[in-house]
Amino acid sequence: MTATAQQLEYLKNSIKSIQDYPKPGILFRDVTSLLEDPKAYALSIELLVERYKNAGITKVVGTEARGFLFGAPVALEMGVGFVPVRKPRKLPRETIAESYELEYGTDQLEIHVDAIKPGDKVLVVDDLLATGGTIEATVKLIRRLGGEVTDAAFIINLFDLGGEQRLEKQGITSYSLVPFPGH
């Protein structure tokens, strides 16, 4: 099933916009309101699965924390493993880490060293693409373990914040269901 304009509009309307959150001047796109609507949540998973089910994906990686909410059901429906990428010291087995820049400083993500095997074809899933820093760090982790990443899928793309272009420079095609301006 290819997404229809009506389906995509339904998804867009299920996402609430919160003015001045988390600080004045920010218009926050709240994907948790989509999760509250079982029809919208199921549709978002269905559309992502439909797009990637014949792409030879062997693992789906989701970034903490909302990436888990979309990545795990996509992996389950596709019959492939799900791999969480988490903040430091949240994974119990041996990990590798990658730092990335935030607006005011740096942060770090980790992945289990045995979660991705050389040659795995990996789809990265997250709730939202903004500047692309989190996904870029996630892709670096996967590639360090020998995985191949060509695509990243999102529910929301804040299209004017440069995330798509940043990922393109890394050879990653981004796909999103709902575009919103970031400013």
Swiss-Prot record:
GO terms for cellular component: cytosol. Catalyzes a salvage reaction resulting in the formation of AMP, that is energically less costly than de novo synthesis. Its main location: cytoplasm. The gene is apt. This is Adenine phosphoribosyltransferase. Belongs to the purine/pyrimidine phosphoribosyltransferase family. It is an enzyme of class 2 (transferase). Disulfide bonds: none annotated. Its EC number is 2.4.2.7. It catalyses: AMP + diphosphate = 5-phospho-alpha-D-ribose 1-diphosphate + adenine. Keywords: Cytoplasm, Glycosyltransferase, Purine salvage, Transferase. Pathway: Purine metabolism; AMP biosynthesis via salvage pathway; AMP from adenine: step 1/1. GO terms for biological process: adenine salvage; AMP salvage; purine ribonucleoside salvage. InterPro entries: Ade_phspho_trans, Adenine_PRTase, PRibTrfase_dom, PRTase-like. GO terms for molecular function: adenine phosphoribosyltransferase activity. It is found in: Cytoplasm. Pfam families: Pribosyltran. NCBIfam families: apt, PRK02304.1-1, PRK02304.1-2, PRK02304.1-3, PRK02304.1-5. Homodimer.
